[in-house]
Amino acid sequence: MSHLVENNILSENGLRVLSLFDGISCGRIALDRAGFKVKDYYAYEIEQNAIKISRYNYPSIYQCGDVFDEDFSKYDGIDLLIGGSPCQFWASSKCSKTAKKKREVKPDGEGWNLFMQYVRALHESKPKYFLYENNYGIGEEIQAAITKELCVEPVLLDSQLVSAQRRKRL
């Protein structure tokens, strides 16, 4: 990791991280386990039980609320933007018949609106690096639209590489 600091990619003081749809701060856990020092971690999450767990594990995390209520330009030049908008709108596996009928397969609807908040944060915060993740089972049309919005091709990973679960992630 020292070559990242030498090349001025990471600050010696630690990363400044903006996390959308933070959940229980698994992004922070992953950064810690990878050996990255984190200076500031700004979390956007609205699920109160997830926030309680995050606060218990990481009292220093700044809990910032709802992504819809924020002007992300105040994070201009942040080191890392991470996030994965809620996947229940796009997931295909293990869905009930009712859920499958409501599953979004086109880039519109509530799931798409949440994803576009990530895109807005990306444009407003202009991070040095970003990571967006979601489930493998999203529809091809949505995946193509995400690729177009982010201007990068997805990389397929199986979460069993880093956890006790077998779940394909993009």
Sequence positions of predicted segments:
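Conserved active-site and SAM-binding loop architecture
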Residues: M1-L170
